[in-house]
A protein has these predicted regions:
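N-terminal Sec/SRP start-transfer signal
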Residues: 1-37, 412
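Short helix-loop junctions at transmembrane helix boundaries
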Residues: 323, 338-381, 394-402
Length: 412
């Protein structure tokens, strides 16, 4: 029989303690732990969710890694073609982390209607393009058919552009593309809108349209085996920098390789701040909860001073008595964690299910607060909070060693 645990249970569940001074203070400590846990869960779930969503959207439009000609200078517009006949295409055997590779080309232009116009970036894609990644963003219609023998005039437009241009599915839109030689007449194309997408990433929705890569090749007077660049997808985003170095070393001296982290450093620097904010919130909440627990335990020790004196007079060591109060603290913290997890998961579920909190897509790149829950992270958080709070209580429970059995008996 664990004597310390037995006595701790008696102290915790004693009916006579309901109206004592320590009772409301213990309830406040439980509430502080619970509120802190809710805040930490929300910080982790929303911070992780926002980071993942932004990563996913960048990958959909650009892949994890891009390979292009040095002369392009990482431009959004494909100016210098590269041959599709590469050792790494269509299977990048030199770098096994690469799961898919696709050839694309981009060209800047303008879509004009009778009343208005919008600048666009036409992204030409071919048979190897992975439409599945973009499928979640399709709001109406379908993706362009680019696998036929004839050059397709179908186009996928964003709902943002469609609304601004007053266009809908089935409409034909006229686009103008400048040629490389300024003196020549611009290329004009008529596209049929077969689908609309909405990624929530304002920067891309405001310009990106998807069409047949052969349209870009024809306008640029490229050969059928010439493309603008290659987009690579890998199996682990966390290893993107290492894989990027491998790809760079494997493509040869005439081509360059760039990860999306290198392409959009300002976005990833901003996203990196989420981790700092999460750690800051966790640290503050643990400190607040810990100090509330210290107050509760000190009050409980003072209230149970006569009991401590009796236990000491019966021969129980200071170490054993401290264990009794640490058992009590574990129960209080555990109760706070239980309520905190329950309330936190409820709030996260409501946000995930009903999208109650909206965001400005132009600022945050998403239209609503995304939620991502990692079971391992939540388990480690609960264990970490419990252990750190108990560690903080080792010092205040030291006052038990200063309590004299003789003096407590006199008080009693």
């Amino acid at each position: 029989l664990n004597t310390e645990y037995f006595i701790a249970k008696k102290v915790i569940f004693s009916k006579g303690d309901k109206g004592t001074i320590s009772s409301p203070i213990i309830k406040m400590a439980i509430a502080a732990i619970a509120i802190g846990m809710v805040m930490m869960l929300i910080a982790i779930a929303t911070g992780t969710g926002l980071r993942q969503k932004i990563r996913e959207k960048l990958v959909v439009f650009h892949g994890h890694i891009q390979i292009f000609a040095y002369d392009n200078n990482a431009s959004e517009v494909s100016t210098h073609p590269i041959s599709i006949n590469q050792e790494f295409y269509p299977y990048f055997k030199q770098v096994p982390e690469v799961t898919h590779i696709q050839a694309v080309a981009t060209k800047g232009g303008i879509i004009r209607t009778e009343n208005t116009y919008e600048s666009i970036l036409a992204k030409g894609v071919g048979k190897d393009y992975n439409w599945q990644l973009l499928q979640d963003f399709i709001t109406e219609g379908r993706t362009p058919n680019v696998s036929g023998e004839e050059i397709s005039n179908e186009i996928l437009l964003s709902t943002y552009l469609a609304n601004r241009l007053h266009l809908k599915i089935g409409d034909h839109c006229h686009a103008i593309f400048l040629k490389d030689e300024d003196s020549q007449t611009p290329n004009q194309r008529s596209f049929k809108i077969v689908g609309l997408y909405n990624s929530g990433f304002q920067e891309f929705d405001a310009s990106y349209v998807f069409t047949d890569i052969r349209q870009i090749q024809k306008m640029n007077k490229w050969q059928q085996d010439e493309v603008g660049n290659f987009e690579l997808f890998i199996n682990d985003f966390d290893r993107i920098e290492d894989v990027g170095y491998k790809v760079y070393g494997a493509v040869g001296s005439f081509l360059d390789a760039q990860t999306i982290i290198q392409k959009f450093p300002f976005i990833f620097e901003w996203v990196g701040m989420f981790d700092f904010n999460i750690y800051l919130i966790i640290g503050i909440m643990i400190i607040v909860g810990g100090f509330n627990m210290i107050t509760a335990i000190l009050v409980l020790i003072l209230e149970k001073t006569p009991m401590i004196g009796v236990l000491k007079s019966l021969g129980m060591t200071d170490h054993s008595i401290r264990k009794i109060f640490l058992y009590n603290a574990t129960y209080i913290i555990g109760l706070g964690l239980l309520w905190g997890n329950a309330l936190g998961f409820l709030l996260l579920w409501l946000q995930q299910r009903y999208s109650l909190i909206k965001l400005d897509a132009a600022t945050y790149y998403v239209s609503e607060v995304p939620i991502a829950i990692s079971s391992i992270a939540i388990i480690l958080l609960n264990i970490g909070v419990l252990l750190l709070c108990l560690l903080m209580l080792l010092v205040p429970t030291y006052v038990i060693t200063k309590i004299s059995p003789t003096e407590t008996m006199k008080i009693k």
